Amino acid sequence: MPRKMYSCDFETTTKVEDCRVWAYGYMNIEDHSEYKIGNSLDEFMAWVLKVQADLYFHNLKFDGAFIINWLERNGFKWSADGLPNTYNTIISRMGQWYMIDICLGYKGKRKIHTVIYDSLKKLPFPVKKIAKDFKLTVLKGDIDYHKERPVGYEITPDEYAYIKNDIQIIAEALLIQFKQGLDRMTAGSDDLKGFKDIITTKKFKKVFPTLSLGLDKEVRYAYRGGFTWLNDRFKEKEIGEGMVFDVNSLYPAQMYSRLLPYGEPIVFEGKYVWDEDYPLHIQHIRCEFELKEGYIPTIQIKRSRFYKGNEYLKSSGGEIADLWVSNVDLELMKEHYDLYNVEYISGLKFKATTGLFKDFIDKWTHIKTTSEGAIKQLAKLMLNSLYGKFASNPDVTGKVPYLKENGALGFRLGEEETKDPVYTPMGVFITAWARYTTITAAQACFDRIIYCDTDSIHLTGTEIPDVIKDIVDPKKLGYWAHESTFKRAKYLRQKTYIQDIYMKEVDGKLVEGSPDDYTTIKFSVKCAGMTDKIKKEVTFENFKVGFSRKMKPKPVQVPGGVVLVDDTFTIK
């Protein structure tokens, strides 16, 4: 008999000295008529211990803290061995919560347990956005989170409806995923399973062999994220009119058409020599460098005492830089920099082909373009989650929760644990080609480029640049979509900028406009780590380094669970 599945949620008090659950709700994911809303954590946990089901909380990192507090105070201890009256967790080294597995015992060989998962790992969006984008039958409401609610507080009809809507939104969205066969713990795992189903597990193992941890470590040195860079010419200055273009599905586009690695790599010493059977390579290189005049910097060095990890460098500053780079990145380096005292140490070369992901991307692109609501959003998720799974870190050493002397949860690092890597070379080259796409387009617009962020270029002026004018389309895979045109803007640093965007009304909806047809201006604030509440305080006048507000909720572990306390957010 299959296990039942439930969507669950807590509502909690907001005072450090009185941290507790004042309301809970659960709903059967497959039968929405089976649900309950109550006001006692003890009552909820009594149900958890007997239900033997799979439960989903949206942001387990928050709600899970209350559950583990309760378990620790009621005789349960953490154990990885599946002993009766223990619980196990999957909490990453970085503090990401994935699972709580509560073991009650065994009936014969059958484990009697309830497992609690994080639906945020399968649906990485706020509940409000899920309800809207999936076009579900209910929408997220609102309540006064700071209202006084003493122990035994009676839930009002409005609060009851709010809680029911929250659990129903996640229940409906998860059910749609499960009906599509997307039943793994995370969106990335769903993607990888779906890809294996298309090419077969047998072929997957042949095409993407498991590399040794030592070899994977060397490959991983060349793995980097998206290209995010602000042109110093425009930093902290108010800018006039400009345009923003985004690549449609940047990473899937590289997976669809670019030359990508497969198979066992061959280690080589010194400098790579062209090999038509192994046309891709990762090169270990030492050098000094100086940025050429009129070129965008592309070298970023992390984990070094000489350089800032998030800064793209104009010079090696007289130091010898030690780099592992894909041949795609190396090509850009040589074009953008003068390299000195170059020493080619060693490297890895790979067989390569195109089209490995064609059937997978064709399938989900077709679903995306022919569907609406939930299925369309799922297709977007499936298209964008797979590439990262290939570069999953094999070091899965996690954190273990415990109760500190003050009664709050603490976390210690668990025993070292590793798993087989998937195939990191694929992640290296997909992301390298993505950076290449963005950087080459930005470089071709050097006189106009303000800012790049992974899949986007922000330009001065309102003319489509020649480099992309023939590949502008709102939907085509890998084409550049015209995201917006702004009247004025101000950029302070990476992921920190504001814009006045031209908008117009079409069929009762506001859409992006132009200087010629706009009917209104939309003020847009993009700032990593800034809450919506703080964004309402931002103006062109006060948006500068040093802007500060004590309005950012910060989760703090306290006896009983977690409380969000107001912390200071400052633009540095």
UniProtKB/Swiss-Prot annotation:
The keyword Ligase does not apply. InterPro entries: DNA-dir_DNA_pol_B, DNA-dir_DNA_pol_B_CS, DNA-dir_DNA_pol_B_mt/vir, DNA-dir_DNA_polB_phi29_vir, DNA/RNA_pol_sf, DNA_pol_palm_dom_sf, RNaseH-like_sf, RNaseH_sf. The keyword Nucleotidyltransferase applies. The record marks K526 as: Stabilizes the primer-terminus at the polymerization active site and contributes to the coordination between the exonuclease and polymerazation activities. This DNA polymerase requires a protein as a primer. The record marks S249, N384, G388, T431, R435, K495, Y497 as: Probably involved in binding template-primer structures. Mg(2+) 1 binds at D142, D166. This is DNA polymerase. Residues 227-572 are annotated as: Initiation, polymerization and pyrophosphorolytic activities. Keywords: DNA replication, DNA-binding, DNA-directed DNA polymerase, Early protein, Exonuclease, Hydrolase, Magnesium, Metal-binding, Nuclease, Nucleotide-binding, Nucleotidyltransferase, Transferase, Viral DNA replication. Residues 223-226 are annotated as: DNA-binding. Gene3D superfamilies: DNA polymerase, domain 5 (4.10.80.20), DNA polymerase, domain 6 (4.10.80.30), Helix hairpin bin (1.10.287.690), Palm domain of DNA polymerase (3.90.1600.10), Ribonuclease H-like superfamily/Ribonuclease H (3.30.420.10), TPR 1 domain of DNA polymerase (3.30.1770.10). The record marks S119 as: Critical for 3'-5' exonucleolysis. Polymerase responsible for protein-primed viral DNA replication by strand displacement with high processivity and fidelity. It comes from Bacillus phage PZA. Its EC number is 2.7.7.7, 3.1.11.-. GO terms for molecular function: DNA binding; DNA-directed DNA polymerase activity; exonuclease activity; metal ion binding; nucleoside binding; nucleotide binding. The record marks Y251, K380, Y387 as: Probably involved in nucleotide binding selection.
